[in-house]
C-alpha cells in the first residue's frame, strides 16, 4: 500500500507540474482558447492511450507503475475542472461560439489523440 501511495503522489505531482509549465508557456498565446489547458488534455489523451495498451499487454509490470502513470501522472496532467471553467467563462460572457469551440477542441481532440495513442502502442508493442 505504501508504494502505491508514493507512486500516485509522485506521478500526480509531476503531471501537475507539467500542466502548470504548459499553462505558463502557452495560455497567453491565444487567451480565447487557453492552449496550455488544451495541450495538457491532448497530450494526456495521447499518453493515456499508449499507457492503457502498454499495461494491458505487459501484465508482468508491477501495479505501482500503472498507478504512477495513469492515476498519478495523467490525473495531475489532465484537467477537467479547468477546462470546465474556461468553457463556462466564455458562456457567461455571452461568447457562446468560443465556449462551443473550446469544448469541441478538448473533446474531439482528446478522443482522437487517445485513439491515436492506443494505435501507436499497439504498433510499437505488436509481436515482430
Swiss-Prot record:
An annotated GO cellular component: plasma membrane
UniProtKB keywords: Cell inner membrane, Cell membrane, Ion channel, Ion transport, Membrane, Metal-binding, Sodium, Transmembrane, Transmembrane helix, Transport
Membrane-crossing residue ranges in chain numbering: 5-25, 35-55, 67-87, 96-116
Biological process terms in GO annotation: cellular detoxification of fluoride
InterPro entries with a match to the protein in the record: FluC
Record keyword Transmembrane helix present: yes
Activity regulation information from UniProt: Na(+) is not transported, but it plays an essential structural role and its presence is essential for fluoride channel function.
Lipid bilayer topology: Multi-pass membrane protein
One of the Pfam families matching this protein, by short name: CRCB
Gene Ontology molecular function terms on file: fluoride channel activity; metal ion binding
Recorded catalytic activity of this chain's protein: fluoride(in) = fluoride(out)
Sites where the protein binds Na(+): 75, 78
Location within or outside the cell: Cell inner membrane
Family affiliation: Belongs to the fluoride channel Fluc/FEX (TC 1.A.43) family.
Function according to Swiss-Prot or TrEMBL: Fluoride-specific ion channel. Important for reducing fluoride concentration in the cell, thus reducing its toxicity.
HAMAP family on file: FluC
Name listed for the protein in its UniProt record: Fluoride-specific ion channel FluC
Native source organism of the sequence: Burkholderia pseudomallei (strain 668)
Encoding gene, per UniProt annotation: fluC
Amino acid at each position: 500500500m505504501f508504494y502505491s501511495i508514493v507512486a500516485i503522489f509522485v506521478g500526480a505531482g509531476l503531471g501537475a507540474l507539467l500542466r502548470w509549465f504548459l499553462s505558463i508557456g502557452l495560455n497567453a498565446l491565444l487567451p480565447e482558447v487557453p492552449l496550455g489547458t488544451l495541450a495538457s488534455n491532448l497530450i494526456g489523451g495521447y499518453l493515456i492511450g499508449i499507457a492503457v495498451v502498454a499495461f494491458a499487454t505487459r501484465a508482468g509490470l508491477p501495479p505501482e507503475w500503472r498507478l504512477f502513470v495513469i492515476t498519478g501522472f495523467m490525473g495531475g496532467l489532465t484537467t477537467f475542472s479547468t477546462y470546465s471553467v474556461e468553457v463556462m467563462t466564455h458562456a457567461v460572457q455571452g461568447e457562446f461560439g468560443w465556449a462551443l469551440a473550446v469544448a469541441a477542441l478538448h473533446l474531439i481532440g482528446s478522443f482522437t489523440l487517445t485513439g491515436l495513442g492506443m494505435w501507436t502502442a499497439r504498433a510499437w508493442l505488436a509481436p515482430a
